[in-house]
Swiss-Prot record:
Family note: Belongs to the caliciviridae capsid protein family.
Keywords per UniProt: Capsid protein, Host cytoplasm, T=3 icosahedral capsid protein, Virion
Pfam families for this protein: Calici_coat (PF00915), Calici_coat_C (PF08435)
Region (Protruding domain): 227-545
The protein's name in its UniProt record: Capsid protein VP1
Ranges where the record places region P1 sub-domain 1: 227-279
Species name: Southampton virus (strain GI/Human/United Kingdom/Southampton/1991)
Location of the region described as Disordered in the Swiss-Prot/TrEMBL record: 1-38
Sequence intervals crossing the membrane: none
Length: 546
């Protein structure tokens, strides 16, 4: 920045320096937000030329997390959406923000509701400045902020400004606190007789955004090696051809019921949707449900190794990668020596393992056979052929919803995948099940539930697409009719949820030839439609109950 000064020194020829341009004494250097290529590369552009196209400023577009729903199950005070001011609220600004290190300015918001004459209720939309926790606000406190109260029957869009209240000159692209747009249910949603089943009746809404004329970006990012951001996708494979992620078998059904266990801690089939593996989950089915280790003839203890033969580092993980996570049952295994150098005969050896005895400590690197191993010393690998009721205590039935004690106690095992539970209101976990051979006290199939198909885990590990929202909205579509059979949420923790249609009527069943399709990113407050109500042609789509 240059300035004129009367105190400027005289030039060499004696002329006064007044009126000449001289450098300012306290010139601030550009902040190196990222490695810069030169002093002129990362300079502020605010107040100069706004590089945002006028079309972007003049047109509203749907926010990436701008879908929300209101149902009679919501109560006053429930948060319908909670959006933070930033370039990520607008797809165009989100793309442009990758070229800059900072941003500043306001945005305009337009809210659309699917109004109709068969519903009544009001919502409140407020702007919560930084420093307030939006999740703890009451309805009365929400009215203290700039707000709009609207009827769900309104046909006109609701428009309001989202001001950039800040105590800094500009915002960097990291996640700094900014103004939040919060929508709550103000009065209960009530439906008339024309709406049919009120449990399945919801009012859908959309949030659209556009930058204000004062919105601008600052500090250009220096040119770097071109990088491509992968878009989030799910495998386009029918469910009937996918496999269980806790043991190798085709998926035989889905459990969609609130009566099923809603808190589980499986260690196989656990993967974040950005590709990070949890627990003992392998990336492919080649290592799944396998046990490998070394044992001496006449001994009972199998010293565990990884499936590929590498040493297992005790205390670093609950068990080797791919180690079975079946708890509350006895394992009956078939193992063979590797490499197999027998000239003839059956190389397989039958052994049994109890998972609730003191010798079962895979976290420490060993498990114990029920009987002495009277076969040659060596390196053995195998898998579980069938399971039975626990030997101790007698009379206990098989429970494949629980995991074994990996150490002397479950709390001693390190790096366990955390338990999961449905975070949304009225939601239930979705399980994919396959039957495993073995007797039980119920004289029924031993259904093994898992949270994700194995092909989904391999896909997420391969793609490693970034997570762009609180949850991914999936539709389960019948490929023959192209009809939507239900809405599901896929959370970043690697599990699906749905809203079962009815309570106490038994688990719902969907046809296994369907395909999950990614629709959009939604807020965790998004209210799912009950399964089976996304289309009026439920009878022809194969939705049925048992």
């Amino acid at each position: 920045m240059m300035m004129a000064s009367k105190d400027a020194p005289q030039s060499a020829d004696g002329a006064s320096g007044a009126g000449q341009l001289v450098p300012e004494v306290n010139t601030a250097d550009p902040l190196p937000m990222e490695p810069v290529a030169g002093p002129t590369t990362a300079v502020a552009t605010a107040g100069q030329v706004n590089m945002i196209d006028p079309w972007i400023v003049n047109n509203f577009v749907q926010s990436p997390q701008g879908e929300f729903t209101i149902s009679p199950n919501n109560t006053p005070g429930d948060i319908l959406f909670d959006l933070q001011l930033g370039p990520h609220l607008n797809p165009f600004l989100s793309h442009l923000s990758q070229m800059y290190n900072g941003w500043v300015g306001n945005m305009r918001v337009r809210i659309l509701l699917a109004g109709n004459a068969f519903s009544a209720g009001k919502i409140i939309v407020c702007c919560v400045p930084p420093g307030f926790t939006s999740s703890s606000l009451t309805i009365a406190q929400a009215t203290l902020f700039p707000h709009v109260i609207a009827d769900v029957r309104t046909l006109e869009p609701i428009e309001m400004p989202l001001e950039d209240v800040r105590n800094v000159l500009y915002h960097t692209n990291d996640n700094q606190p900014t103004m939040r747009l919060v929508c709550m249910l103000y009065t209960p949603l009530r439906t008339g007789g024309g709406s049919g089943n009120s449990d399945s009746f919801v009012v859908a809404g959309r949030v659209l955004t556009a930058p204000s004329s004062d919105f601008s970006f600052l500090f250009l990012v220096p040119p770097t090696i071109e990088q491509k951001t992968r878009a989030f996708t799910v495998p386009n494979i029918p469910l009937q051809t996918l496999s269980n992620s806790r043991f190798p078998s085709l998926i035989q059904g889905m459990i969609l019921s609130p009566d099923a266990s809603q808190v589980v801690q499986f260690q196989n089939g656990r993967c974040l949707i950005d590709g990070q593996l949890l627990g003992t989950t392998p990336a492919t089915s080649g290592q799944l449900f396998r046990v490998r280790g070394k044992i001496n003839q006449g001994a009972r203890t199998l010293n565990l190794t990884e499936v590929d033969g590498k040493p297992f580092m005790a205390f670093d993980s609950p068990a080797p990668v791919g180690f079975p996570d079946f708890g509350k049952c006895d394992w009956h295994m078939r193992i063979s020596k590797t490499p197999n150098n027998t000239g003839s005969g059956d190389p397989m050896r039958s052994v049994s393992v109890q998972t609730n005895v003191q010798g079962f400590v895979p976290h420490l690197g060993s498990i114990q056979f029920d009987e002495v191993f009277n076969h040659p010393t060596g390196d053995y690998i195998g898998t579980i052929e069938w399971i039975s009721q626990p030997s101790t205590p007698p009379g206990t039935d098989i429970n494949l919803w629980e995991i074994p004690d990996y150490g002397s106690s479950l709390s001693q095992a390190a790096n366990l995948a955390p338990p999961v539970f449905p975070p949304g209101f009225g939601e239930a976990l979705v399980y994919f099940v396959s039957a495993f051979p073995g007797p039980n006290n119920r004289s029924a199939p031993n259904d093994v539930p898992c949270l994700l198909p194995q092909e989904y885990i391999t896909h997420f590990v391969s793609e490693q697409a970034p997570t762009m929202g609180d949850a991914a909205l999936l539709h389960y579509v019948d490929p023959d009719t192209n009809r939507n059979l239900g809405e599901f949420k896929l959370y970043p923790g690697g599990y699906l949820t749905c809203v079962p249609n009815g309570v106490g009527a038994g688990p719902q069943q969907l046809p296994l030839n369907g395909v999950f399709l990614f629709v959009s990113w939604v807020s965790r407050f998004y209210q799912l439609k009950p399964v089976g109500t996304a289309s009026t042609a439920r009878g022809r789509l194969g939705v049925r109950r048992i």
